[in-house]
Amino acid sequence: MWWPIGPYGTIMAFILASTIPLRNLLTRDEPEERLRLSDLPQEIRSKGYKWHISLYLAMYLFKAVIDHHNEPLKSRVGGYTHWVHQLEGDFTLWAQEAFRNDLLTEALAFHYLFVYLFIIWFVPIYFILVKDHVMADKAALNYLVVYVLAVPLYLFFNVEVTSSFIPGMDALLYHDSWYIEFITNNDPLDNGIPSLHFGLPLGLLIINRLHCREMGIPLKEWRHRELDLFIIINLGIYLFSIQYLGIHWITDTIPGIILAFICAYFCHHWQPLLRDRPTKGWRSIMPSSRGIALAVAFSVACTSAIALVAIDGPGSEEDVANFRLGPGDLVIDTIEVHSLNHPVTVEIRNVGEFGSLCVILERTHVVSDFEKGRFSNGFDFNDLLEYPYHQVVPLISGESWRGEVETPSILDTSLVICHSSGGISELRISMEYVDDELIFTGILASLPAFIITGLVVDVASRSEGVEGEDSADVDA
């Protein structure tokens, strides 16, 4: 499918066009609470919303830094998809096969990208546009904190998408002509754990409940109850779509749930402290000595686990497959552009019993040849060999190939596309980049997650202690 502004531009246009109408729909019973657009600049200045804008810009840069680390670290970290597969098997394949329908695929693919970006953008904007600065703060913090918490798992516990590892499962979203360029530019396809498509909206739901409990308001009487229902409905859709589209394992949602709780407690506790900081000073947001001790303890313990277990650990064993494909299946791995002058060293090892054929070629040649996880009608793997290519790699069981691929342009990249004509092929595809020694900075980027976790443990334990004392007083 061709469209001049692509999926991201289309989705952002939808988001911008629907923001005010949806705000008006959700506040139809209280129009007096709406902020006039002409008053928005003054509201931004008076409520200090400039830091929200700065936060989103910082988040964009931080994500770019993490993405820059992801692939180079894999040569030392490897992946753990085989562990997840051993745990839950091929259950998600059933979800795809039982409900597969072209119209459903189109709807869920658009929903997967649209609603996630919509929740990131709309929820804090909605709270700003209905003059609720407390919830606007918490929603903006939720986006930043939940991603920060996910960084250690993204960098040091790689899990491939289900469609790359379950034979017979198609990448209904990722291997499609309209999405493939956007996806290969923005998603390494091995950040299965945790699922932030599940964790981010769940964090908002938990924040909503903590807020209502603090205010003494029943959730059903909260003025933003309809927004809460909107998020709940979309969370339910995500639970199905991430399996149906060949993206997430069910297991991926569990760390997402855990991070959502940690994130929600952090945002709920620190929002008023951050909001009052200009008047009370920096000392007002400093954690207790116990909180600092727990943050340091978590940082030391988790950093040690990364250094001693994750790096050159069980995920990096050369005989462990990170791609599995059945007869007629195809898998795609992206060769990222990290340097215009230094080639990427690519190694493909056949660690299974059946042979496989791989071709390495530039994405621009094949972007229109995929449709809903498969080749377009009338096109097959052999047609790829008609394009200019870097290398064709036929591999029988036990064979490996190692070579260099140039990345001369930031406007295009190369893809490793592999195919199995018979039997279940198991491959290990690894790449070495010029900046592959990023272990130290990767660990540094993970430290905020460990610090936040330690601080939340301190706050949560103190809250439980206070509630216990209150209950004892009531009983007495």
State where each predicted segment sits.
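Alpha-helix N-cap/helix-initiation motif
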Residues: N191, I247-H248
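Terminal transmembrane helix and immediately flanking juxtamembrane interfaces
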Residues: M1-V159, D170, H175-F182, C212-Y244, ...
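Alpha-helical transmembrane segments of helical membrane proteins, especially in multi-pass transport
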Residues: D187-L210
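Extracellular acidic loop/turn motifs
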Residues: I193, E353-S356
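Juxtamembrane/interfacial segments flanking transmembrane helices
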Residues: V161-P167
